[in-house]
Amino acid sequence: MIYSNLLKKHYSDWPSLEKAIEALPTAKARGNVFEEFTFAYFTIKKQMYQIAEIYPSADIPDKYRKAFKLGNKQHQDSGVDGLIITNEGKSIAYQCKFRSGRVKPTYEELTKFWSDGRYCDYCCTVANSFAVSNLSDKHEENLQILAKDFDSLDQEFFDQLYDLVNNENAGKNKVFYEPYDYQKRIIKEVLVGFSVENRGKVIAACGTGKTLTSLWIVEAMKAETVLFLAPSISLVKQTLEAWADQAKIPFTYLCVCSDNTVSSNIDDDEADISVSQLGVTRNYKHQRDCQVLRPHKG
């Protein structure tokens, strides 16, 4: 990937970069830079999205073009801006939509993409808007990465972005947090507890860092299989993002939703998000999931 000079500058947050992209003179120029940013975003977030391979549209290998019927390299208006192959071999076609003022892309704009990417396992809409068409939530194969995801990116991400687009090691500025003293005490007591008991419970107040404390406990125990249960999709996303960012050993995850209507009434709970806004692959086939989690013999 050859990155534009605009991306090679050092930014501190997404609004600053977004403003710079908005200042470009044409919609095509803005779209091109956003596609480059999206490619870099996925490259930095490979653990989060379980990415084995990623290609911008022009670089998609012929074997994948043929397998997923994405047209040839000269077919530039296919609606698919890039392709991801996950660690477990799933295919994700993605399309980038940048709009000044964070205007939501229309249903008509997205239907061509959904049509052209229909032979992939998933279609992911990447947009700088707060939402896309509600019809996207009707299909469990649709994923979304939106403005809220970009707004939450921290300084460390943009340090990595700067290194990546300037051909440096994107991980050289990676910062791994260390537990506070009270978290060290929690970790120690949990390890001692599990040495003599099969069950335990940690009760801690909000804001005490339970998400990362749980990760450090898992790493200290050298656990091979972890079941994480959450009451909302947004909490699943929050935990997955934190663990993917801070895990010192790469891990594979499997997101399971109770059913495909779990987020059908999210207007009643402003704190939650739709399943598609989880942004990662997931499924509802419980029997298969139980098989995956069952210990293998031999």
Predicted segment positions?
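Catalytic centers of nucleases
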Residues: 29-118
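Short linear interaction motifs
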Residues: 19-24, 79
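Structural motif
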Residues: 97-98, 126-130
